[in-house]
A protein has these predicted regions:
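Bacterial N-terminal signal peptides that target proteins for export
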Residues: 1-10
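A short hydrophobic beta-strand segment most commonly corresponding to one strand
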Residues: 137-153
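Short beta-strand His + acidic residue motifs that chelate non-heme Fe in jelly-roll/DSBH
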Residues: 85, 104-105, 123, 129-136
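Glycine- and acidic-residue-biased ligand/ion/polar-headgroup-sensing regions
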Residues: 88-109, 119
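A short beta-loop-beta micro-motif enriched in histidine and acidic residues
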Residues: 65-68, 80-96
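Bacterial N-terminal signal peptides
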Residues: 9-19
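A short, N-terminal "cap"/entry segment at the start of jelly-roll beta-barrel domains
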Residues: 5, 23-71, 112-114, 156-162
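Short acidic-glycine-tyrosine-enriched beta hairpin
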Residues: 77, 108-127
Length: 162
């Protein structure tokens, strides 16, 4: 009897350990893992990522806005690729996962967040920073719509060789 109780206890402990280390499901941070103060996260460099600007809309004159643009991009992340660490303090964004699976490492969640095709996530707020990884061998594709300034739009323009 003692052996089976011990075995069950060890199995339960291992299950709890793996559950704590496993990414969150359903594309959002579990309520009990949401942080009220942002944590430090790794400063990751981008690996295997390509970005294509699909459209840019000048918001000049709309509700008194000037110098800001609504931009939509397509990002393709290679298998085992990384979207670098970046902030959304001053750049609201909505990301839609078109294809594949990504894991987000966020300053406001104590566990990694798993995102799958068909899911979306808002990105904005003081202290909001994150990086994404593609844990699979297959490419992942997302669209990202954000509000950016003229300098950011200029960075998106193709460089002309003269």
């Amino acid at each position: 009897m003692m052996k089976s109780t011990t075995t069950i206890g060890i199995a339960a402990a291992l299950a709890a350990l793996f559950a704590a280390a496993a990414p969150a499901e359903a594309g959002q941070c579990p309520k009990d893992k949401v942080l009220t103060v942002p944590r430090d996260i790794e400063g990751m460099d981008g690996v295997g990522i390509s970005r294509e600007t699909l459209a840019t809309v000048d918001l000049k004159g709309w509700r008194g806005v000037g110098g800001l643009f609504l931009r939509t991009r397509r990002l393709t992340i290679a298998g085992h690729g990384i979207v670098p660490t970046h902030e959304h303090d001053d750049r609201p964004s909505i990301v839609f996962i078109v294809k594949g699976e990504l894991i987000e490492h966020s300053t406001y969640c104590s566990v990694p967040i798993r995102h799958k095709a068909g899911e979306w996530t808002p990105e904005f707020g003081k202290g909001h920073a994150h990086w994404w990884e593609n844990p699979t061998d297959q490419e992942a594709v997302v669209t990202s719509s954000d509000i950016v300034d003229q300098e950011t739009v200029d960075l998106d323009k193709p460089k002309m060789d003269m």
